[in-house]
Amino acid sequence: MAMKIRLARGGSKKRPFYRIVAADSRMPRDGRFIEKLGTYNPLLPKDSEERVKMDVERVQYWLSQGAQTTDRVARMLEAAGVVGKTERSNPNKAVPGKKAKERAEEKAAKAAAATEAAAEE
């Protein structure tokens, strides 16, 4: 079985509430799960103790059994100090795109033309 530790949505429309569950990855998002590991209520303030609750011991058990976490649950576990922070490396993100380079070149050309015109006068 491909196990995942993920969020299962509950609550009503515009009032989300999530359960942190260990589930087979092939099961529906809100469907059958193996064990409930905690809860997440995004409507509460970020500094609230009740916002994220989880059974850390059981989470560590499922991680030791080979369960993979989703991105959002991994961030919650990092914040709780259960797992180490994963390094995210995307060196191309800071490189400007084609259009940005073209705009910068046009701006530099206009600035150079303006300084030449000012120097001639």
Swiss-Prot record:
The keyword 4Fe-4S does not apply. Keywords: Ribonucleoprotein, Ribosomal protein. InterPro entries: Ribosomal_bS16, Ribosomal_bS16_dom_sf. The keyword DNA-binding does not apply. One of its GO terms (molecular function) is structural constituent of ribosome. Residues 110-121 have a biased composition (Low complexity). Residues 84-121 are annotated as: Disordered. It holds the Pfam family Ribosomal_S16. Transmembrane segments: none annotated. One of its GO terms (cellular component) is small ribosomal subunit. Gene3D superfamilies: 3.30.1320.10. GO terms for biological process: translation. Belongs to the bacterial ribosomal protein bS16 family. This is Small ribosomal subunit protein bS16. It comes from Ruegeria pomeroyi (strain ATCC 700808 / DSM 15171 / DSS-3) (Silicibacter pomeroyi). The lineage of its organism: Bacteria, Pseudomonadati, Pseudomonadota, Alphaproteobacteria, Rhodobacterales.
